[in-house]
């Protein structure tokens, strides 16, 4: 993340987390600056022009801060000419299992934010409502295969025709880069004050086959940006 615009976007997106304390602020900056999926979802125009979002396993809400900052800069006329318009955000709902992260989100966004609502809950149990976009970034492999399939079926049922499910997975067939991903995942989760049990990962081909069998069209693209990892973005749309 080197261009002046991206630095401005990063500053704007991480600003709300100053009120959440040193860790929340620097965690948001580190994640948003080093993780190419945030930039690419905007640059490639993957998101609808306007819509309601549900982020499952949302953590402290870094994705929402990023999208809000993007829309603010777009409306101010500070936006790359070759990028699609930043999406209009009708509703941003996040579900996070860990109360510590929910508390950090509350300090960042406040209790009466007009768009953002982040709640403590388990994605295996909560009602998904009727969003236009559902995201799971790096949390789908935290629970077993049967629950993964159940969550994906419920995501498909919750989305409207053409609705977007955007996720990122670690490709279990990638060898050493996959194992490096897992090590980093455990390390980051530990720093956030949590512990991870076994991770339930799959080869990329198996993820794609499962999602297509549930009624999604699937496109996939590596999201590593020069790092020796095995992260893959899956862009899934309900037929």
Describe the function of each predicted region.
Residues 1-51, 60-127, 166-239:
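Class I (Rossmann-like) S-adenosyl-L-methionine-dependent methyltransferase catalytic domain
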Residues 56:
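Conserved beta-strand/loop positions that form the S-adenosyl-L-methionine
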Residues 135:
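A conserved beta-strand element that flanks and buttresses the S-adenosyl-L-methionine
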Residues 138-139:
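Short catalytic micro-motifs in class I SAM-dependent methyltransferases
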Residues 144-145:
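Helix-capping/helix-break motifs at membrane-protein junctions
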Residues 149-161:
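A short glycine-rich, Lys/Arg-flanked "PGG" loop and its adjoining helix->strand segment in the class I
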């Amino acid at each position: 993340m080197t261009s002046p615009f991206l630095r401005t976007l990063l500053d704007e997106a991480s600003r709300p987390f100053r009120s959440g304390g040193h860790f929340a602020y620097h965690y948001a900056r580190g994640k948003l600056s080093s993780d190419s999926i945030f930039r690419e979802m905007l640059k490639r125009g993957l998101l609808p022009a306007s819509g309601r979002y549900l982020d499952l396993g949302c953590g402290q809400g870094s994705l929402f801060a990023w999208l809000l900052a993007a829309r603010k800069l777009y409306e101010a006329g500070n936006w790359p000419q070759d990028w699609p318009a930043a999406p209009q955000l009708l509703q941003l709902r996040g579900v996070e299992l860990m109360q510590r992260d929910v508390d950090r989100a509350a300090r960042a966004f406040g209790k009466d934010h007009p768009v953002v609502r982040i709640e403590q809950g388990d994605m295996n149990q909560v009602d998904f409502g009727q969003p236009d976009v559902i995201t799971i970034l790096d949390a789908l492999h935290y629970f077993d295969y049967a629950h993964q399939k159940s969550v994906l079926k419920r995501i498909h049922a919750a989305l409207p025709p053409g609705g977007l499910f955007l996720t990122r997975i670690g490709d279990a067939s990638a060898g050493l880069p996959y194992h490096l991903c897992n090590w980093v995942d455990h390390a980051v989760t530990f720093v956030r004050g949590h512990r991870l049990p076994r991770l339930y990962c799959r080869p990329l081909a198996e993820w794609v086959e499962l999602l297509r069998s549930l009624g999604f069209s699937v496109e996939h693209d590596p999201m590593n940006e020069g790092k020796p990892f095995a992260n893959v973005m899956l862009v899934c749309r309900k037929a």
